[in-house]
Amino acid sequence: MKKIALIIAMISLQSCITVKVNADVDSNSFYRKVDNPNIKSQGTFFDKGVGDSKWSNSNGDNWTKAKFDDASGTSYIKLKLSKSLTVSFHSDIHLKGDINFEIVDQNNEVVFNRQLTNSKEENFKLDLAKGDYQVRWNSTNATGSYFLEWKEEK
């Protein structure tokens, strides 16, 4: 009887852990379980290393997020488009400090830019040519978090 109770307790605990891991994406996610066959992502990268001891981040196939405390410097992800596409983005930035949020193409041309000193959530679409892009967050004494997700339009 004790073994059965222990097995039930272990199964219940495993279910709780699974729920926690699955909930890690973001409760405000707009583009859950999308298929982006023409967009490949990599990252997170840093221009000069992580200058924030409390920095944490995670990434998925169509999203990235980070939390930070007194961050200064540039973090970025890479997106590679195998063909020209219209891409929908959902950005949710919670902020104290300054962040320049931008998307640049392989020629270092800025295709999207937001200079932020306050929190901002927005949806936007970009017509992007085939090629490589960097999504950058240039921060100065910033505390907060960012969440970005994307999907290709059909």
How should these model regions be labeled?
Residues 1-4:
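Positively charged n-region of N-terminal signal peptides that target proteins for export
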Residues 92-100, 141-144:
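Extended, low-complexity, turn-rich repeat/linker tracts enriched in Gly/Pro/Ser/Thr and Asp/Glu
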Residues 95-112, 150-151:
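Short, surface-exposed beta-strand/strand-loop-strand elements in extracellular ectodomains
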Residues 12-15:
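C-terminal motif of bacterial Sec signal peptides marking the signal peptidase cleavage site
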Residues 85-89, 125-143:
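Noncatalytic modules at the cell exterior or secretory-pathway interfaces
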